[in-house]
């Protein structure tokens, strides 16, 4: 264990030094670009820059922007009347709500219409999750503090190993 910590420290030290050198190279190139920009500004008067900006604003096609916005609004209004879109929106809202409710709570607490934990909820084993879900731990057993285990949708290679309730 001590060897692993020493190795981790050496790797961290190496990464800090490597990124430090990279940062100084980036800072030097950014400083050069800034110096060139300041030289350019020094050569050009502010009045001519303002005149150029005003001319660009006058040339801009505001009518095209407004017509595109109007078309986008009409498409959104048409989509909002579509039944499939409404179903997808409802599903998305429910999924976001389930993911947002990913805090720990007592097993058996109602989540929606179920008496089990929602997808994305922190879990300790498969028995915390609904029968059609499983408890997934991305970090395995070696680092549970860094990545929490959550209830996930059961896929073909994963199964809920909790014994059925009697």
From Swiss-Prot:
Q: Which positions fall inside the Oxytoxin-type inhibitor cystine knot (ICK) domain?
A: 113-166
Q: Give the UniProt record's GO annotations in the biological process aspect.
A: defense response to bacterium; killing of cells of another organism
Recall the GO molecular function terms of this protein's record.
toxin activity
User: Subcellular localization, per the record?
Assistant: Secreted
Q: Which GO terms describe its cellular component?
A: extracellular region
Family assignment from sequence similarity: Belongs to the spiderine family. Cationic/spiderine subfamily.
Record's protein name: Spiderine-1b
């Amino acid at each position: 264990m001590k060897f692993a910590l020493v190795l981790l420290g050496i790797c961290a030290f190496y990464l800090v030094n490597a990124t430090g050198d990279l940062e100084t190279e980036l800072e030097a190139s950014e400083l050069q670009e800034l110096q060139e920009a300041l030289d350019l500004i020094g050569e050009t008067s502010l009045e001519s820059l303002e005149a150029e900006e005003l001319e660009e604003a006058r040339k801009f096609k505001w009518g095209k922007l407004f017509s595109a916005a109007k078309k986008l609004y009409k498409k959104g209004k048409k989509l909002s009347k579509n039944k499939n879109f409404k179903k997808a929106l409802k599903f998305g809202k429910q999924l976001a709500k389930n993911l947002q409710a990913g805090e720990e709570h007592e097993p058996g607490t109602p989540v929606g219409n179920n008496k089990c934990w929602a997808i994305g909820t922190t879990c300790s084993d498969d028995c915390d999750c609904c029968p059609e879900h499983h408890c997934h731990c991305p970090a395995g057993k070696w680092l549970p503090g860094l990545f929490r285990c959550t209830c996930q949708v059961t896929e073909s290679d994963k199964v809920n190993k909790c014994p059925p309730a009697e």
